[in-house]
C-alpha cells in the first residue's frame, strides 16, 4: 500500500499541502509547493509525489496522497493542476513513479479513482484515467471503481425515485420512455464511461466471463 517517495517531508508540510488540496485553495497550494521545492532543491513533482498522509489510521491519518482529496470533492481545477505537475515538463519523475502516485492506495486500499468514482465525479475520473489510473485496482474490500460508481447509482435510485413514482405513473408510456432514455444518473455516467474506455474494456470482458462462469456453475 505504501508508495516509495522521492524525498521526506515533515508531517507539518504534508498537513499544509493536504489542507490546501482538500479545501480547494489553489493559490495556497501553488505557494506551498514552490516554497517546499526551493527548500528541498527539487522539482515540485517530487513534492507532490512525496506528500502522503502516512500517519496511522488510529491517529487520524488516511494514507491518502494529494490526488485523493480533489478527486473526492470533484475539484477538477486542483486535480488537473496536480496531475500537470506530476506529468508535464521536466518533472524528473519516471513513468513508474508517476503511476505509483496516481494509483496510490490509502489505508483502506482506495485510490483517487475509487474516491472520484464513488462520488460520481466524471471529469475527475476521466482526468485520472488519462493520467494512468488503473481501472482494475480493487480496494481492501475487493471493490473496483466501476462497482463503487454502480453502488452510488443504486443509492441515488433508492433515495430519489420513490417520491416521484406516483407522478411517473400518470404520464403517458411513450413520454416516460423518452424521459428515461434522455436522462442518466451521474453514477451510471461514470460506469458507462469507465467500461467504454480503452482501459475499461478488459475489465468489462473479465466481468462478463466471471458472470458467465458463475451462471454455468450454478446450473451444474
Give residue ranges: language-model regions.
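Conserved hydrophobic residue in the first alpha-helix
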Residues: 17, 67, 113, 145-146
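Ankyrin-repeat-protein effector appendages
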Residues: 1-17, 150-220
Amino acid at each position: 500500500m505504501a508508495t516509495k517517495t522521492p524525498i521526506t517531508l515533515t508531517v507539518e508540510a504534508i498537513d499544509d499541502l493536504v489542507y490546501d488540496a482538500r479545501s480547494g485553495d489553489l493559490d495556497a497550494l501553488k505557494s506551498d509547493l514552490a516554497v517546499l521545492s526551493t527548500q528541498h532543491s527539487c522539482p515540485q513533482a517530487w513534492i507532490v509525489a512525496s506528500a502522503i498522509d502516512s500517519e496511522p489510521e488510529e491517529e487520524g491519518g488516511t494514507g491518502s496522497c494529494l490526488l485523493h482529496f480533489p478527486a473526492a470533492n470533484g475539484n477538477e481545477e486542483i486535480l488537473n493542476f496536480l496531475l500537470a505537475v506530476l506529468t508535464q515538463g521536466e518533472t524528473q519523475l519516471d513513468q513508474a513513479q508517476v503511476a505509483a502516485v496516481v494509483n496510490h492506495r490509502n489505508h483502506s486500499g482506495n485510490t483517487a479513482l475509487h474516491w472520484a468514482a464513488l462520488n460520481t465525479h466524471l471529469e475527475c475520473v476521466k482526468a485520472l484515467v488519462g493520467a494512468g489510473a488503473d481501472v482494475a485496482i480493487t480496494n481492501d474490500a475487493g471493490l473496483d471503481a466501476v462497482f463503487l460508481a454502480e453502488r452510488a447509482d443504486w443509492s441515488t435510485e433508492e433515495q430519489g425515485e420513490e417520491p416521484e413514482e406516483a407522478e411517473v405513473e400518470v404520464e403517458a408510456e411513450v413520454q416516460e420512455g423518452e424521459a428515461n432514455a434522455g436522462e442518466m444518473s451521474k453514477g451510471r455516467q461514470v460506469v458507462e464511461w469507465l467500461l467504454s474506455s480503452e482501459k475499461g474494456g478488459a475489465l468489462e470482458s473479465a466481468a462478463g466471463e466471471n458472470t458467465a462462469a458463475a451462471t454455468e456453475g450454478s446450473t451444474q
